[in-house]
């Protein structure tokens, strides 16, 4: 009887061990994967889309490094002023007369319409030596009359003086007002050399214009 029990008990154990080797365990173990399946899963993992956070940061980095550097503003080009010994040409005198008469006579609308012509004329007389320009004004009664009319039009005069002062200060920074040139200019117009020198050294351009307008040579 004992032999019979041992025999069947041993057979049952063999049967259970055989079943456990071919069936999943109660803990959910899965059959072993072959090499091809492992490679396929690793490829899928690598191709998995980035999470929202990673996607956002990588996008920000791309934008940061692709951002263009701000363009540097070009430095203003200073005029290459002519020498005081260089006389004005007839064309330059014509351009000066046009600018003064337009600013003195034209209405606001007419000035706006003639803006291109005025700018063109100004660009052509831009490099005339400041003292030569003032001397040309003082020697022409029509230009003196035009300058006085401009003084009566505040907004025109303010714009004119702002641009003129800027150009004259640029000339001063380049050393265009030599002692000899200032003395020759004052002598030509019958002005006191010391007074003119003081005005030029102080860059009081509005005062210099006023002296020229009020003390014409003819």
Swiss-Prot record:
Q: What is its main location?
A: membrane
Q: Which UniProt keywords apply?
A: Cell membrane, Lipoprotein, Membrane, Palmitate, Signal
**What is the membrane topology noted in the UniProt record heading this document?**
Lipid-anchor
Q: Which locations, inside or outside the cell, does it occupy?
A: Cell membrane
Query: In its keyword annotation, does this UniProt entry include Lipoprotein?
Result: yes
> Any keyword Metal-binding?
no
- Annotated signal sequence range: 1-21
Q: Identify where the record puts lipid attachment of type N-palmitoyl cysteine.
A: 22
What does the record list as coiled-coil region(s)?
A: none
CC per GO annotation: plasma membrane
Question: Could you tell me which residues are lipidated, with the kind given as S-diacylglycerol cysteine?
Answer: 22
> Member of which family?
Belongs to the chlamydial CPn_0875/CT_734/TC_0107 family.
Q: What is this protein called?
A: Uncharacterized lipoprotein TC_0107
Species this protein is from: Chlamydia muridarum (strain MoPn / Nigg)
């Amino acid at each position: 009887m004992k032999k019979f029990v041992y025999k069947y008990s041993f057979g049952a154990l063999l049967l259970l061990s055989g079943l456990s080797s071919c069936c999943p365990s109660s803990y959910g173990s899965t059959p072993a994967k072959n090499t091809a399946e492992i490679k396929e899963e690793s490829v899928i993992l690598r191709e998995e889309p980035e999470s929202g956070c990673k996607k956002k940061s990588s996008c920000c980095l791309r934008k940061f490094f692709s951002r263009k550097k701000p363009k540097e503003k070009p430095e203003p080009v200073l005029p290459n002023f002519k020498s005081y010994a260089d006389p004005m040409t007839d064309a330059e005198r014509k351009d000066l007369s046009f600018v003064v008469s337009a600013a003195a006579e034209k209405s606001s609308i007419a000035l706006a319409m003639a803006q291109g012509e005025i700018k063109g004329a100004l660009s052509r007389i831009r490099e005339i030596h400041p003292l030569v320009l003032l001397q040309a004004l003082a020697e022409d009664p029509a230009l003196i009359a035009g300058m006085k009319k401009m003084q009566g039009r505040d907004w025109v005069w303010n714009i004119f003086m702002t641009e003129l002062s800027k150009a004259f200060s640029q000339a001063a920074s380049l050393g265009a007002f030599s002692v000899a040139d200032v003395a020759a200019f004052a002598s030509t117009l019958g002005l006191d050399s010391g007074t003119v020198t003081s005005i030029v050294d102080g860059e009081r351009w509005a005062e210099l214009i006023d002296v020229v307008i009020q003390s014409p040579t003819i």
